[in-house]
Amino acid sequence: KIKTHPTQSSKIYRPLFDIESENCKFVDDNFFECISTADLLITSASTTCMEALAIGVPVAIIGAKSQILQNPIPKTIPDDYWRICYSSSELIGFSKSVINLNENELILESERIRDSYFLLPTNENIEELIHLNHQI
């Protein structure tokens, strides 16, 4: 499935790519519905990288050597689960390596990511965040 950014319509991109098939199609579904069934997220840079990793979906960030790279993934997250790809061959290579990932290890890493980088929006957590902002 190909999901465009929420501020853009897939109708803009469909005429540019002749890839509509049963195996590859543009969708306008909710991001979380799409990512929960994905095997790999391919993006240029977004907070969706961390959201995908947190639910056990590996991430490929498309980089361009002529542009500043915006990588939202902390260095503490093993690069077995994400990769910066500067060429189609790098993307294909990473896609193939994703197939061989140990699913149990991926689940454990996604749990570690959730525990380390995400908080439930409870009143207590929100108050703590507001308090931290006042100290800055």
Please state what every model-predicted region is.
Residues 118-136:
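C-terminal alpha-helical cap of glycosyltransferases
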Residues 4, 9-21, 47-118:
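Catalytic binding pocket for nucleotide-activated donors in carbohydrate/polymer assembly enzymes
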Residues 36-44:
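Acidic donor-binding loop of glycosyltransferase active sites
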Residues 1:
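Short beta-strand elements in bilobed, periplasmic/extracellular small-molecule ligand-binding domains
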Residues 21-29:
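Active-site donor-binding acidic/aromatic loop of nucleotide-activated sugar
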Residues 29-33, 37, 90:
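Short acidic active-site motifs
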Residues 40, 97, 132-135:
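Residues within well-ordered alpha-helical secondary structure of globular protein domains
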Residues 28-31, 45-47:
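Conserved glycosyltransferase catalytic-site signature
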